[in-house]
Amino acid sequence: MAGIDYTERIPNNVALHENRRLQRALEDWQPKFLEWWHDMGPNGFQAKDVYLRTAVSVDAQGWAKFGYVKMPDYRWGIFLAEPEAGRQVNFGDHKGQPAWQEVPGEYRGTLRRLIVTQGDTEPASVEQQRHLGRTCPSLYDLRNLFQVNVEEGRPLWAMVYLRVAHFGRDGREESEALLQRRSGDSDKPRILGAFNEQTPDWLSYFMFCFFTDRDGKYQLASLAESGFDPLSRTCRFMLTEEAHHLFVGETGIMRIVQRACELMREHKTDDVRKYGGIDLPTIQRYLNFHCSVSLDLFGSEISTNAANFYTTGLKGRFEETKKQDDHQLKAATYQVAELDGDGIVMREEPALVSLNERLRDDYVADCARGVARWNEVIRKHGIDFELTLPHRGFHRAIGVFAEARVSPDGRVISQAEWDARRGEWLPTEQDKAYVQSLMHAVTEPGKFASWIAPPARGINGQPIEFAYVRLG
């Protein structure tokens, strides 16, 4: 088991005390991070005791302990997965060479951009969600929100460590800039579009955890294949934490769907709004929105940047080492959806420039498995309704579909039809106002808002009625 040294000012398992220059630089950044957390972290709950898990090891088994912590006292630190003896670069032009412990000079700029972009997403989601605690549907959900928030703070530390340790002054300056950008700010926005969207309510939050955090899973898994070993080890541990965030999203939506179905059965109506529920068509519209903006996070379908990341050994495919090919792809092709007049066709493209689309395909297949579990809840209640993922061309702002109008079922349509039917497919102002009207805090242990069912079980073996956050 790889233990973490909590006697240090910055908890870590990288022997930080052996590099005084690096230690001083990170200790200089620490109060700036804490100032950002106080300013932009969860609003109104900084002094409350929250039942949180804290990493005590980087092993997959028994890696965390649970206990009450005030969020500003959470021990954020630098945790890398254990090194793999004899690890090699597993793809690209450097396949078979020993994995790099230092940044290759010729790839310095490219790798820095990758780390900057990934690191920018972590604080952005905290900023997007900072007001949600005031409208929590239960203490159970409030605790899960705060767990996600503090665990978005820790990968931020990991990316800052990589920048400062391996990129010198540039890395230090970028770490400062990271705390100056703000989600949705007109002057200093976050880098990626989805992280500038508002998260004003808990339906949006659960959709964000399911769709947008799942993009994070696939990006981290691709970076975990990197030939740059410190980045690989960082991302491998981050994936351990990411699983809970996806669980929060999937089970959150499932519980909203379950409650809608219960109200439909109880009152023999599809209109559950009059009974304080969120109707299934509204859930579908929110699903369409969050899925489409998350699909944009994978980038353009055809991308020379993605090809360069791969050939240089910096960013692989999802589960790269499990794939049965030459791991260089120079003669390989891959099917990509493209516009062809008024239709959409599949065309063979060089596999190297199609890597964004391949990762998007892996992501969509994973999303579909979660949606199938939601539909199973609907079927068990005997209700004739099915939630569906929209076509990948729907409501896109990046890539080949950015200039097109595509319906959720994959038809290329006119602007007039889009304008006429947009309210069927995406949340309307009335939808948003209704969902917002439901957002009232429920803080009695074991009680839940009218629009969401209780979970199947509590956290870490605790009962559902456990005081997950002490508000007194």
Label for each model-derived stretch:
Residues A124, F211, D215, D229-H244, ...:
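Short, well-structured alpha-helical interface segments that form or flank functional binding sites
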Residues L132-D187, M238-I256:
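Long, hydrophobic, well-ordered secondary-structure blocks that form the structural core
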Residues Q129, P155, M159, D213-S222:
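Long, well-ordered alpha-helical segments
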Residues Q118-T121, W202-G216:
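Aromatic-rich carbohydrate-recognition surfaces in CAZymes
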Residues M1-Y140, A165-T199, C291-G472:
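Terminal targeting/low-complexity segments that flank the catalytic cores of oxidoreductases
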Residues H131-R143, H166, Y218-M238, G252-T282, ...:
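Inter-helical turn/loop segments and adjacent helix faces that build the functional surface
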Residues E173-R182, K188-N196, V257-C291:
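Short non-catalytic regulatory patches outside canonical folded cores
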